[in-house]
Curated annotation (Swiss-Prot):
<dbReference type="GO" id="GO:0046872">
    <property type="term" value="F:metal ion binding"/>
</dbReference>
<comment type="function">
    <text>Cytochrome b5 is a membrane-bound hemoprotein functioning as an electron carrier for several membrane-bound oxygenases.</text>
</comment>
<feature type="binding site" description="axial binding residue">
    <location>
        <position position="68"/>
    </location>
    <ligand>
        <name>heme</name>
    </ligand>
</feature>
<dbReference type="GO" id="GO:0009055">
    <property type="term" value="F:electron transfer activity"/>
</dbReference>
<dbReference type="Pfam" id="PF00173">
    <property type="entry name" value="Cyt-b5"/>
</dbReference>
<feature type="modified residue" description="N-acetylalanine">
    <location>
        <position position="2"/>
    </location>
</feature>
<dbReference type="GO" id="GO:0016020">
    <property type="term" value="C:membrane"/>
</dbReference>
<dbReference type="InterPro" id="IPR018506">
    <property type="entry name" value="Cyt_B5_heme-BS"/>
</dbReference>
<keyword id="KW-0249">Electron transport</keyword>
<feature type="binding site" description="axial binding residue">
    <location>
        <position position="44"/>
    </location>
    <ligand>
        <name>heme</name>
    </ligand>
</feature>
<comment type="similarity">
    <text>Belongs to the cytochrome b5 family.</text>
</comment>
<dbReference type="GO" id="GO:0005789">
    <property type="term" value="C:endoplasmic reticulum membrane"/>
</dbReference>
<protein>
    <recommendedName>
        <fullName>Cytochrome b5</fullName>
    </recommendedName>
</protein>
<dbReference type="InterPro" id="IPR036400">
    <property type="entry name" value="Cyt_B5-like_heme/steroid_sf"/>
</dbReference>
<keyword id="KW-0492">Microsome</keyword>
<keyword id="KW-0479">Metal-binding</keyword>
<keyword id="KW-0812">Transmembrane</keyword>
Length: 134
């Protein structure tokens, strides 16, 4: 059952949130806040199915991956019904770290200057030969 603190914030347990994962009641967690998206299902630009796949669980990573607009973020605030209970916050899987591989640029003056210079020289010679035939 939801608990209330002194600040009138309703806290929901993860177990309670997981019960709301169908089209009659669709709740998701975003940044430890609980959203009731039931009335928004048909209005969602990405389609109802996208929200239903995340229903009853943490949708933070997927929400951020999509790159929602400022308007979408403002609209989402109207669907907040409470927060995930602090005791359950550690139960949510943290997003896996994304490894970014960078390629060190070992390109030398050879590839940056000599090859383009030779290519330009060849094109100039071919042009000159072509013009000489006329």
């Amino acid at each position: 059952m939801a608990e209330q603190s002194d600040k009138d914030v309703k806290y929901y347990t993860l177990e309670e949130i997981q019960k709301h994962k169908d089209s009659k009641s669709t709740w998701v967690i975003l940044h430890h806040k609980v959203y009731d998206l039931t009335k928004f299902l048909e209005e969602h630009p990405g389609g109802e199915e996208v929200l239903r796949e995340q229903a009853g669980g943490d949708a933070t990573e997927n929400f951020e991956d999509v790159g929602h607009s400022t308007d979408a973020r403002e609209l989402s605030k109207t669907y907040i019904i409470g927060e995930l209970h602090p005791d359950d916050r550690s139960k949510i899987a943290k997003p896996s770290e994304t490894l970014i591989t960078t390629v060190e640029s070992n390109s030398s003056w050879w590839t940056n200057w000599v090859i383009p210079a030779i290519s330009a020289l060849v094109v100039a010679l071919m042009y000159r030969l072509y013009m000489a035939e006329d």
